[in-house]
């Protein structure tokens, strides 16, 4: 396969496929999304507990459906009929808590992974006695410019939002009067109500702003990032989109980015009294360098929940603050000899008398139930499996709903435990189930897929009974039947350390055990991640298998789904055991009669790119070629929250950082290497690629490199993805 062009290879494969009545896959089919399953977008359960809404495909309507029947009830919003509507389509929407108003987002502009600005509109849904909307005039939320994270008050009469790092309040009963709550917000200095870059990226949220249950207070987190070091990257005129203002001289984007060991933002929780206009700062006993990853008002307006972590992230505290006296009381503490996983925050849900929590205190992630006084009532789940998500508690019958991998680390199922402790599995098929429950907990929409089943969407009641099938993707199955598509199969093997690892393998369609095939290994390998899952997908790896490669993915030590001991065994020295496991995978594959052991390659993106470099320089010359896309190369270059969670600081763990650096073992790099990076990567900075490339140059190591102008960590836009995957394909065709 060496030095063969894609065009020639596809011609040969097409001739073979045509003889069988099937077409060969084309790279454009993959990058264009031709085989992307049909899905339901923009689904929101309505406050009444009986209905849900969804956007239509072109973003012009919001349609109401019955959870019980799946039948369309009515169109509750249409851009063509809403009076004084000055936009043609919209991007997203939300309901007021009472279900009487819509907040509609248009002209959405992404900022980072979760954050964006948008122009929002308010639309009334109130009906008269005849069920007719009494006022269908749509109004702008604000004329002062795009907004971030707008949130309704519980009674639906107010909306708070952030603009330019300051918080604003709009009172809907007073002609949408707008007032500014904070005045000190300033770019790269002070942020109110939204997280800074590292909080957003690593704690996974974009709003730090909450109303109290009695509509009298707004609580928010204030970030002072003035002492956080800045990072800048160049911005060029580029293409797709073109920035004409930079056609002669490039610009620069600067933002605050705390690298491992450097200062974080100073954080505090404040409350604003809407009536008296008084702002108070909570007296929170937080370490000077501690984190506040979430705040949330409970059902009691006098109890503001504040979640904190110490900088090592091995101690989690939940405080209840009195928003007026500012006093804080510790309600719960959870500690780990390693670190507390970030999925804990959104699985804490508050009810009038109770709250939920996920903890790994017994070695596996399980659901715990507490009184609002902070006393443990019971451990709801138990066993050598992981609870993935707490879905909710039915206050009427005392039942708990959650997803877990009890069946297999590769699968996710939906379960119910009633108040007597009886457990019932609700999901009917083995694979990956992702449910969305109604507000009443009586119904749920389930999205299911498995290795051989693309997205299947059903409506179910809370006993698991299927009420209606919404999406089958039969049309996609019919389309795929005309193509020669390689299929995944699971396998396991045991390493020389006696560790059992899970993997999947895709063989070429016309696989023959009497032949020897080149192998391309794909992996991510990051802490807590999983790539080996019983879920459906067609990707670039599928395309490579169609070209005659055996494609393999193995989740090594440090990945998720198998309990704390397996996942956290890499603590303080990430990258070392993971690389050894990828090398052992290659050695295991090389012993198979159908594998050409001299033609094994590896690739990955982000942490997977880092693992490519670590594996190719592990000291065992088993890889002939590898591609590292957007790879961190030295953890001193990466952010505080992610890096220190697993490694602590460079000062505390100097030897661990040295062993975990791709620089340390670069002299042992073996095989043909392609480095790929976006120059506008705000997450894994281009610095990682540039410095590692210089290291290879000085070591006399030859390598290939592909740089993408103005592209971030995702490396997309215009023709970029097509170019990227063509580059990767050609590299492996010529070097493997």
Q: Where on the chain are the PLM-derived regions?
A:
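Serine-hydrolase catalytic core recognition
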Residues: 301, 433-736
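Non-catalytic accessory segments flanking enzyme active sites
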Residues: 40-44, 50-62, 91, 103-105, ...
């Amino acid at each position: 396969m060496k030095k063969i062009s894609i065009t020639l290879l596809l011609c040969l494969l097409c001739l073979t496929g045509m003889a069988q009545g099937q077409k060969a896959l084309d790279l454009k089919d993959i990058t264009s999304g031709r085989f992307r399953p049909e899905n339901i977008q923009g689904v929101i359960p309505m406050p009444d507990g009986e209905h849900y809404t969804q956007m239509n495909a072109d973003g012009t309507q919001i349609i109401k459906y019955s959870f019980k029947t799946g039948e369309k009830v009515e169109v509750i919003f249409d851009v063509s009929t809403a009076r004084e509507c000055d936009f043609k389509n919209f991007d997203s929407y939300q309901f007021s808590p009472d279900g009487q108003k819509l907040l509609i987002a248009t002209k959405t502009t992404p900022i980072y992974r979760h954050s964006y600005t948008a122009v929002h509109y308010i639309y009334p849904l109130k009906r008269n006695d005849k069920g007719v909307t009494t006022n269908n005039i749509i109004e702008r939320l604000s004329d002062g410019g795009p907004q971030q994270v707008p949130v309704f008050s519980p009674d639906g009469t107010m909306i708070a939002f952030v603009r330019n790092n300051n918080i604003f309040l709009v009172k809907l009963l007073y002609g949408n009067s707008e007032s500014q709550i904070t005045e000190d917000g300033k770019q790269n200095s002070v942020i109110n109500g939204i997280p800074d870059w590292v909080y957003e990226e690593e704690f996974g949220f974009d709003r730090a702003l909450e109303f109290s249950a009695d509509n009298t207070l707004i609580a928010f987190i204030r970030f002072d990032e003035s002492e956080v070091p800045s990072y800048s990257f160049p911005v060029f005129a580029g293409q797709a989109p073109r920035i004409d203002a930079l056609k002669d001289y490039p610009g620069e984007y600067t933002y605050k980015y705390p690298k491992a060991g450097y200062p974080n933002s100073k954080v505090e929780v404040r409350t604003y009294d809407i009536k008296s206009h008084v702002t108070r700062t909570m007296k929170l006993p937080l370490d000077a360098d501690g984190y506040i990853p979430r705040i949330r008002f409970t059902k009691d307006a006098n109890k503001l929940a504040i979640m904190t972590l110490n900088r090592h992230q091995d101690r989690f505290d939940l405080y209840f603050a009195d928003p007026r006296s500012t006093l804080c009381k510790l309600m719960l503490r959870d500690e780990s000899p390693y670190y507390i996983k970030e999925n804990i925050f959104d699985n804490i849900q508050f009810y009038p008398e109770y709250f939920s929590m996920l903890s790994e205190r017994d070695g596996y992630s399980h659901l715990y139930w507490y009184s609002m006084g902070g006393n443990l009532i019971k451990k709801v789940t138990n066993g050598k499996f992981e609870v993935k998500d707490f879905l909710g508690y039915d206050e009427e019958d005392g039942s708990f709903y959650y997803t877990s991998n009890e069946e297999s680390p590769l699968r996710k199922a939906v379960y119910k435990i009633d108040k007597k402790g009886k457990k019932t599995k609700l999901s009917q098929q083995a694979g990956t189930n992702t449910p969305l429950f109604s507000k009443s907990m009586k119904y749920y929409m389930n999205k299911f897929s498995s290795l051989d089943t693309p997205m299947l969407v059903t409506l179910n009641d809370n006993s698991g009974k299927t009420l209606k099938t919404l999406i089958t993707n039969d049309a996609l199955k019919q389309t795929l039947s005309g193509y020669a598509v390689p299929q995944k199969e699971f396998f396991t093997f045991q390493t020389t350390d006696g560790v059992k690892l899970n993997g999947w393998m895709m063989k070429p369609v016309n696989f023959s055990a009497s032949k020897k095939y080149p192998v391309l290994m794909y992996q991510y390998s990051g802490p807590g991640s999983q790539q080996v899952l019983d879920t459906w997908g067609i990707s670039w790896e599928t395309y490579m298998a169609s070209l005659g490669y055996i494609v393999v993915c193995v989740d090594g030590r440090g990945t998720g789904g198998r309990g704390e001991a397996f996942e956290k065994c890499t603590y303080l020295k990430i990258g070392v055991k993971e690389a050894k496991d990828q090398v052992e995978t290659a050695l295991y594959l090389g012993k198979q009669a159908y594998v050409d052991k001299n033609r094994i390659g590896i690739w990955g993106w982000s942490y997977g790119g880092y693992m490519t470099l670590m594996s190719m320089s592990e000291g065992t010359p088993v890889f002939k070629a590898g591609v590292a896309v957007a790879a961190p190369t030295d953890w001193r270059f990466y952010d505080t929250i992610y890096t220190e969670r697993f490694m602590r600081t460079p000062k505390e763990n100097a030897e661990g950082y040295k062993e975990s650096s791709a620089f340390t073992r670069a002299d042992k790099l073996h095989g043909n290497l392609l480095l790929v990076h976006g120059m506008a990567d705000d997450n894994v900075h281009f610095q990682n690629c540039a410095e590692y490339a210089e290291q290879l140059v000085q070591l006399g190591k030859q390598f290939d490199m592909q740089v993408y102008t103005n592209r971030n960590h995702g490396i997309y836009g215009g023709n970029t993805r097509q170019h990227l995957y063509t580059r990767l394909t050609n590299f492996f065709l010529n070097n493997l």
